């Protein structure tokens, strides 16, 4: 801990006393909040809060079991169907967080992949997921299609190309169409993490790709989801341990 402090790497939590729109109260002082992911200010919206109250009164505050036992309610089912329609995909699977969703996707595909290529600035959850399944972490230069092409040329077998869509630190966007074209021509699947784009920009989801987004940013709530082909989502239900055992 002392080393972390000396190297200015020690993490701490600030206690938020009250949040009023784009202002927060810390230690009795009102501050403008520039660090929130609540992009559309829905987390504190009156209609959203009213909907939560209705949901609590109807379904309670917990599911009481995992999805594959007795915890998958009609509310979960309706949300999955609505998200599938919004994203234009065949089926959706809900997860508790984006971190869990990314680990769940990688863990399900573990035995089907020979290589993975990731953008240099991908989110930590994607990097951790890569490490957890035991495949080498290979990263191409950020948003550089030529670098990705060079990396792909050295691979063999079935691959996965992974990118954030909107990158959280700078707000730049991946070239989804070019990445998908490379994936199709090189025995690979493309996966995008759209945590920071969902609800802000129109989803761009190529056929046969994997799409993950969160509900805790622009949507102002919590959770995450994966959308794609029905067979792939069914495969996640069977093989994604973070989903099965949560």
Show the residue positions of the predicted features.
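Short beta-strand-to-turn element immediately C-terminal to the catalytic PLP-Schiff-base lysine
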Residues: 42-43, 200-203, 224-230
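Conserved PLP-anchoring active-site segment centered on the Schiff-base-forming lysine
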Residues: 105-124, 145
């Amino acid at each position: 801990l002392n080393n972390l402090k000396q190297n200015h790497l020690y993490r701490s939590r600030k206690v938020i006393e009250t949040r009023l729109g784009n202002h927060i109260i810390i230690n009795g002082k009102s501050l403008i909040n520039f660090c929130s992911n609540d992009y559309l200010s829905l987390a504190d919206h009156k209609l959203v809060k009213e909907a939560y109250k209705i949901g609590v009164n109807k379904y309670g505050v917990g599911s009481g079991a995992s999805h594959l036992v007795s915890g998958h309610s009609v509310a979960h089912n309706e949300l999955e169907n609505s998200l599938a329609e919004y994203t234009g995909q065949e089926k959706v699977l809900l997860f508790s967080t984006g971190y869990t969703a990314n680990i769940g996707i990688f863990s399900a595909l573990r035995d089907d992949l020979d290589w993975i290529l990731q953008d240099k600035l991908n989110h930590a959850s994607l990097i951790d997921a890569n490490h957890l399944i035991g495949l080498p972490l290979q990263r191409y230069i950020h948003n550089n299609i030529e670098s990705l092409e060079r990396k792909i040329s050295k691979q063999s077998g079935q691959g996965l190309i992974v990118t954030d869509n909107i990158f959280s630190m700078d707000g730049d966007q991946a070239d989804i169409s070019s990445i998908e074209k490379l994936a199709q021509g090189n025995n690979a699947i493309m996966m995008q993490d759209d945590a920071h784009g969902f609800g802000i920009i129109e989803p761009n989801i190529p056929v046969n790709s994997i799409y993950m987004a969160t509900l805790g940013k622009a949507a102002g709530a919590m959770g995450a989801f994966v959308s794609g082909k029905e067979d792939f989502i069914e495969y996640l239900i069977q093989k994604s341990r973070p989903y099965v055992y949560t």
